[in-house]
A protein has these predicted regions:
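Acceptor-substrate binding/catalytic loop of class I
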Residues: 132-147
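Conserved S-adenosyl-L-methionine
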Residues: 158-168
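A conserved beta-strand element that flanks and buttresses the S-adenosyl-L-methionine
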Residues: 94
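A short glycine-rich, Lys/Arg-flanked "PGG" loop and its adjoining helix->strand segment in the class I
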Residues: 106-118
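Conserved SAM-binding loop and adjacent beta-strand
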Residues: 2-16
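Class I SAM-dependent methyltransferase SAM/SAH-binding core
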Residues: 32, 38-82
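Conserved beta-strand signature within the Rossmann-like core of class I S-adenosyl-L-methionine
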Residues: 119-127
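Hydrophobic adenine-recognition pocket in adenosine-nucleotide-binding enzymes
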Residues: 98
Length: 175
């Protein structure tokens, strides 16, 4: 449904943007996929990752992800709590279509900072909002403003290497 009916291509779009932003990345030692779902988000990245961890709330989705052999370890639970308890440092943090289910991103970005270092890459998608901070939409998903995202990235010492607006999915047949 996600790929066929909604023309969903966010993981591949994010990977292309990431590749375009960096000349050569080599292989990442430790990567974490926040809201990994069925593994759709991690599949474009996993070949360049030595140790790949996926986190998701849905045990059913993690069962599907496990069958794809993308991740070395899967964690079932709340992303904020899982990140808070994580002991490893990650050089790549991925989150595709997860922050749309979280309004205030300050706590999760702070927890992401705790598992990263200066050289880490944090790549993610959000739905764009042209207002202040964030908004809960009729779809039940949140949109976040660029200024809000930039502010909490700055607070947590992340620099924006690239930012791009694109269509992630069709909504009722429209982009």
């Amino acid at each position: 449904h996600l790929i066929n009916n909604l023309n969903y291509n966010a993981p591949n779009q994010l990977k292309e943007l990431f590749d375009k932003s960096l000349k050569e990345t080599g292989v990442f030692k430790n990567a974490i996929d926040i809201g990994c779902g069925t593994g759709l988000s991690g599949s474009p990245f996993y070949k360049k990752i030595e140790n790949f961890v996926g986190i998701d709330l849905s045990e059913n989705m993690l069962t599907i992800a496990k069958k794809k052999n993308i991740y070395n370890r899967l964690v079932n639970g709340d992303a904020n709590l899982a990140l808070k308890n994580e002991k490893k440092i990650y050089d790549l943090i991925i989150s595709v279509d997860t922050f749309i289910y979280i309004g205030n991103l300050e706590a999760i970005f702070e927890n992401i900072k705790k598992i990263s270092i200066t050289e880490s890459f944090f790549i993610f998608t959000t739905e764009h909002y042209y207002g202040d901070k964030f908004k809960l939409n009729k779809s039940g998903r949140y949109s976040h403003s660029y200024d809000y995202i930039k502010k909490i990235l700055d607070i947590n010492s992340f620099k924006i290497l690239n930012f791009e607006e694109s269509n992630l999915r069709k909504e009722k047949g429209k982009w």
